[in-house]
Amino acid sequence: MKRIYVISDATGETAERVIRAALSQFYYDEVRVVRLCQIHNENDVQQAMSVAIAEPGMIAYTLVDPSLSQKVAQLAEDHGMYAVDLLGGLIYSLSCFLGATSQAKPGLLHRIDTDYFKRMEAVNFTVTHDDGQDTQYLHKADLVLVGASRSSKTPLSMYLAHKGYKVANVPLIIGIDPPVELFQIEQEKVVGLVIDPKRLVEIRTSRLINMRQSPRGNYADYQRVEDEITSCRRLYRQHPQWMVIDMTNKSVEEAASEILRKMAVREKRITEARVKGDIS
């Protein structure tokens, strides 16, 4: 059984993924990847290398401190072990290309990796909770968007998901009660979308034409659309804790920015109230 030692100043998870991706190119199963992590000084390097030297193998390291990288390389050479710097060459090349000095902060690679997987998890959640699907899991959402059909619920949900927020959206339809779960979750999570009826008629008409369907019917009828928006506004007034966003002539990016800004203000207010002891 051959061993590959991953020496990292963070968790080593990203480096291990790189190693395993490279290993997948070989028909060789008898390899064990051993992580030696949180290496922050020469004493840590010495201890990690002692483990590797006891059962020699290949060294793969990601250390942003050049002196520690050099120490690992020297010890590996002294004991006849292969060693590869997974990060140093790239950082040096980027430094030359950008004309800038690296931050040399341990763990940034892992943080970026973690952020990526958080976004992917949010996107997956949002896709599976689009248009009123699986409402029994609304409590797991960071935000729940509600509104009439074609009020930008889905594109806004996906935009926020790519920023790492788990978003569900629920359509509001005249004559059909919203799912009971909507009123059982934390109400500050709910965002009600409104839009000018004339603008919504234009959007729905365009949608029908693109689908080669007749725009004549209730879906794009002005009175019907106006009734839908009136019904939405009535529901929002009954739930003052809900945030309300007007989507009329507003881009998805602008709406998302407004939501996140209001969320930040709300969180700050709640935090200040807790500090003062006004709420538990």
UniProtKB/Swiss-Prot annotation:
Q: Where does ADP bind?
A: G147, A148, S149, R150, S151, S152, K153, T154
Show the GO MF annotations: ADP binding; ATP binding; phosphotransferase activity, phosphate group as acceptor; protein serine/threonine kinase activity
Its UniProt entry gives the catalysed reaction(s) as: N(tele)-phospho-L-histidyl/L-threonyl-[pyruvate, phosphate dikinase] + ADP = N(tele)-phospho-L-histidyl/O-phospho-L-threonyl-[pyruvate, phosphate dikinase] + AMP + H(+); N(tele)-phospho-L-histidyl/O-phospho-L-threonyl-[pyruvate, phosphate dikinase] + phosphate + H(+) = N(tele)-phospho-L-histidyl/L-threonyl-[pyruvate, phosphate dikinase] + diphosphate
Q: Tell me which positions the record assigns to the signal sequence.
A: none
Protein name (database record):
Putative pyruvate, phosphate dikinase regulatory protein
Q: What keywords were assigned to this record?
A: Kinase, Nucleotide-binding, Serine/threonine-protein kinase, Transferase
The record lists the organism as Pelobacter propionicus (strain DSM 2379 / NBRC 103807 / OttBd1)
Q: Which InterPro entries match?
A: Kinase-pyrophosphorylase, PPDK_reg
Functionally, this protein is described as follows:
Bifunctional serine/threonine kinase and phosphorylase involved in the regulation of the pyruvate, phosphate dikinase (PPDK) by catalyzing its phosphorylation/dephosphorylation.
Family of the protein in this entry: Belongs to the pyruvate, phosphate/water dikinase regulatory protein family. PDRP subfamily.
Organism placement in taxonomy: Bacteria, Pseudomonadati, Thermodesulfobacteriota, Desulfuromonadia, Desulfuromonadales
Its top-level enzyme class, in one word, is transferase
- PANTHER family reported in the protein's UniProt record: PYRUVATE, PHOSPHATE DIKINASE REGULATORY PROTEIN 1, CHLOROPLASTIC (PTHR31756:SF3)
